[in-house]
Amino acid sequence: MKAVLQRVAEARVVVAGETVGQIGQGLLVLVCAERGDAEGQADKLLAKILKLRIFSDEAGKMNRSVQDLDGAGKQGGLLIVSQFTLAADVSGGNRPSFTDAAAPDEGRRLYDYFVAQALALHPMVQTGQFAADMQVHLVNDGPVTIPLHIDPAA
């Protein structure tokens, strides 16, 4: 399973002119299920995202997670957006291949599982819409952008 995290001051997802998900300070999480992924990969990826210390402390060091933005328990938002294009393979030419992405039904199942687990573990979760044409608006903070990958064999 793959994800790209972007530390944001704010972010929102628009579908057909309507905002479907919106957060203030937190993480925009672009997520992709790959062939061979299962719930175990989703669990490991979510655990890493929630614990990753990429928010600054008082000294300006990346020392805080989305679960503790201010050192006093303030939590940031998670905006979770499905993006199968993270599985793109461009090694064979100039047109990306997406054969490494999970099949659409399996991708939706794992995305829904990932979101459900996030909702169970974190109080501030918003989402995009699976397989929709979305416009993602964000104010990248830093910028800080972190790619994550949990191997299907893990």
From Swiss-Prot:
Motif (Gly-cisPro motif, important for rejection of L-amino acids): 142-143
Cytoplasm recorded as keyword: yes
Recorded GO CC terms: cytoplasm
Signal sequence annotation: none
Any one GO BP annotation for this protein: D-amino acid catabolic process
Reaction equation(s) it catalyzes: glycyl-tRNA(Ala) + H2O = tRNA(Ala) + glycine + H(+); a D-aminoacyl-tRNA + H2O = a tRNA + a D-alpha-amino acid + H(+)
Keyword annotations from UniProtKB, A to Z: Cytoplasm, Hydrolase, RNA-binding, tRNA-binding
Location within or outside the cell: Cytoplasm
Gene3D superfamilies tied to this protein: D-tyrosyl-tRNA(Tyr) deacylase
Family: Belongs to the DTD family.
Comment on protein domains: A Gly-cisPro motif from one monomer fits into the active site of the other monomer to allow specific chiral rejection of L-amino acids.
Protein name per its UniProtKB record: D-aminoacyl-tRNA deacylase
Organism: Polaromonas sp. (strain JS666 / ATCC BAA-500)
